[in-house]
């Protein structure tokens, strides 16, 4: 995907792995890495990604949220979790592009995250890449269970709904936003997302884009269908 994109001047990541009471933005100049995973080989805890932070962008994000009536705060001590540094290491391995991270809100309310995305429309920052890092299927028990026709059917039904919701140009934006706000009504939604933190980065990205996605990329991971969406 990075090869198809103009190289950004900075990156804003919304990761499924960070929740706070209010939206919180990393604002340090040299973010550390948070190895927030367990049971992996020792090499997984030696990964390095020494990208710079971008305090000016962090302040702009906080101001955009404040102007939309959304209280936010800066955190100059927190580093980047693996929802940020893993995709960034694959996309931009030289680690020269400044990066900041924006938390989810721990209520996990879909409409709140759509509103956060809409607030980010006020950002005035040239060539900013906004990366929603999550998973369109995140039932860990099902990932490691034997694949069955029933599990596959549930997975595919939700993926089809999500692709249509994000990509169907015949939907109006109010219709698209309502479907995402009411995502629990989708086929097998709670089977695919027993907890919704891995879905909500998508809501922030759609709230910012406010249009049908330009591209859908399907992938199979541990036998389960998953989808990624690109807005240009």
For the regions a language model picked out, list residue spans one by one.
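A short aromatic-anchored loop/beta-hairpin motif
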Residues: 1-68, 72
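Surface-exposed, charge/polar-rich loops and edge strands
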Residues: 60-63, 67, 97-98, 106-108, ...
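Short beta-strand segments
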Residues: 12-17, 103-105, 131-133
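Short, basic/glycine-rich phosphate-binding loops at helix/coil junctions
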Residues: 36-41, 92-100, 181
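Conserved ATP-utilizing enzyme core subdomain
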Residues: 70-96
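Gly/Ser/Thr-rich loops at beta-strand to alpha-helix junctions
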Residues: 17-20, 135-139
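Short acidic (Asp/Glu) patches
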Residues: 43-47, 79-86, 113-116
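Flexible, glycine/proline-enriched loop segments at strand-loop-helix junctions
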Residues: 44-52, 74, 103-110, 189
């Amino acid at each position: 995907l990075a090869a198809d994109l103009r190289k950004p001047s900075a990156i804003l990541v919304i990761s499924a792995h960070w929740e706070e009471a209010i939206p919180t933005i990393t604002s340090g100049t040299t973010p550390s890495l948070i190895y927030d995973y367990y049971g992996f080989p020792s090499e997984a805890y030696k990964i390095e990604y020494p990208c710079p932070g971008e305090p000016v962008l962090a302040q702009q994000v906080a101001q955009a949220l404040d102007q939309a009536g959304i209280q936010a705060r800066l955190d100059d001590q927190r580093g980047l979790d693996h929802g940020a540094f893993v995709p960034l290491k694959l996309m931009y391995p030289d680690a020269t592009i400044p990066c900041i991270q924006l938390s989810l809100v721990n209520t996990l309310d879909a409409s709140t995250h759509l509103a956060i995305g809409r607030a980010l429309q006020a950002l005035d920052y040239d060539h900013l890449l906004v990366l929603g890092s999550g998973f369109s299927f995140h039932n860990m028990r099902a990932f490691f269970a034997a694949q069955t026709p029933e599990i596959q059917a549930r997975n595919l039904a939700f993926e089809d709904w999500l692709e249509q919701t994000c990509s169907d140009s015949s939907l109006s934006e109010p219709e698209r936003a309502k479907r995402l706000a009411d995502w629990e009504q989708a086929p097998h939604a709670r089977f695919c997302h027993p907890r919704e933190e891995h879905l909500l980065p998508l809501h922030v990205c759609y709230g910012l884009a406010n249009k049908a996605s330009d591209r859908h990329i399907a992938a199979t991971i541990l036998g389960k269908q998953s989808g990624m969406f690109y807005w240009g």
